A protein has these predicted regions:
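Short amphipathic alpha-helix segments
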Residues: 141-159
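Short glycine-/aliphatic-rich beta-strand segments at the starts of folded cytosolic domains
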Residues: 129-146
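Short amphipathic alpha-helices in soluble, non-transmembrane regions
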Residues: 150-156, 183-192
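Terminal, non-globular segments
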Residues: 174-183
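Active-site beta-strand/loop microenvironment that shapes enzyme catalytic pockets
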Residues: 78-127
């Protein structure tokens, strides 16, 4: 069964300074290695005069593809710590590039690891992160006498209505997390003794960004 996963929804920029060296983190949502590499190249062109543009990315709903680069920094001091930040935060389909402008003072391997880690974390904190939840779209038709019961049930479960149509009957579309589909079908059957007409219309992912409901047409 498909599982929920976290990703950057809107990437942002963050900067830290360590012994006069500037570390600038840029994050972005990507859905393929090609998109990740294209974004990395964009950042390299933007900061063309920087000494290093180190990067890390995780692609896939279960972080199936993971890559990183130290871009000239000592081995394991930049890309790997940045990748650890992404994996530790559970971020999928995300790329981070940290640009370094050398400040004249050597940081040592330990200092570099701490600086690149801190920059990547600052970038994650500055970005908008969402959790995409696999869901099924229900269409339920009830009578006017039954609509109160249905809306109460949805409120109890914390489900968001997508659309309501009041005609001869009342039709309500709403999303149910995939893991709760069976229990929802059972509760509808018990609550309306089989009189409610229920259809499964679609599958996909949704996320909540504050009060905003985001819908994604992704294969579940």
């Amino acid at each position: 069964m498909s599982e929920a996963y976290k990703t950057v929804y809107i990437g942002d920029t963050a900067e830290i300074v360590e012994k006069k060296s500037r570390f600038i983190a840029n994050l972005e949502h990507v859905e393929s290695e090609e998109e990740a590499l294209a974004y990395i190249e964009t950042i390299r062109k933007k900061y063309w005069d920087a000494r290093h543009n180190c990067y890390a990315y995780c692609i896939g709903k279960k972080q199936e593809l993971k890559r990183c680069s130290d871009d000239g920094e000592p081995s394991q001091t930049a890309g790997k710590p940045m990748l650890d930040v992404l994996t530790g935060a559970g971020l999928c389909d995300t790329v981070v590039v940290v640009t370094r402008y050398f400040g004249g003072t050597l940081l040592g391997t330990g200092g570099l690891v701490r600086a690149y880690t801190a920059a990547a974390k600052a970038g994650v904190e500055a970005s908008e992160v969402i959790e995409k939840i696999p869901a099924v779209q229900f269409l339920v038709k009830v009578t006017y006498n039954q609509i109160g019961t249905l809306l109460y049930l949805l409120g109890q479960r914390g489900y968001s209505q997508l659309e309501s149509e009041y005609a001869e009957d009342v039709s309500v579309r709403f999303l149910v997390p995939l893991t709760e589909r069976a229990s929802m079908e059972k509760q509808l059957l018990e609550s309306f003794q089989g009189s409610a007409k229920t259809e499964i219309e679609d599958y996909g992912y949704y996320a909540k960004n504050g009060k905003e409901l985001l819908l994604f047409e992704e294969e579940v």
